[in-house]
């Protein structure tokens, strides 16, 4: 693995956190727990930056070998090397934490913390030189997603969040800013993001996305994590995927939650195991879920 720079990092003032109406012992416990989380979030930001630098060494290069996995999804050396880098760094820094990733076997957790990693979400975009692919790192604590990082290496852009600390957005060398989902209340004014038609047809759900498209103002096929990041940063109201693995959605759940929105499965449940996913604003959630919940179920769900 090549040496890489530490990258962007945000340091939170954990010592100044206050928890009203709590005993001193409980405040200390909560402060300790929050410190553990924010240490991990800061490290996740570093890891996403390091992985992104590695990925860009392969981006838009001649002769990039693209293989097909068992499910026919593409994978490259950049996918594998980036996840391996993340796993190796995690083993050194947080050896008791578990890791669930797309490219390698699971590592069980010994302390309740688990990292859920997709080194390149949007490998097809990456392979074809489209900059909308991202590195996703989610942090789970006792089965709850508590922090997430979504970094777009080719655009030098990152969206991240941790429980109780808001959702933040940073582009290149600009100052980071806190971000929120749009306040749109009328679905006819909404902007919809969706993924490639192949998945909609293969799951028998093409008519479902058409039903949502008929309701909104604008529909664009900017899929994968980029579409969901658009919702978190106030540039879209709805992003829908008919197929999502745990590593596709894990980082997005806390990001959307802290941005004031929702990232759930099509039944409206906040879970990494639903098999599908939607990011949506609070005002439009019930309308969108009402449509999605009528879709044909995924096999085994």
Regions found by a protein language model. Give the residues of each.
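N-terminal subdomain of lithium-sensitive/metallo-dependent phosphomonoesterases centered on the IMPase/IPPase/PAP
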Residues: 25-120, 283, 287, 293, ...
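Residue-level signal for inorganic ion chemistry
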Residues: 55, 79, 90, 123, ...
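Acidic active-site catalytic centers that drive phospho-/nucleotidyl reactions
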Residues: 73, 79, 83, 102, ...
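DPxDG-like acidic metal-binding loop motif
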Residues: 109-168
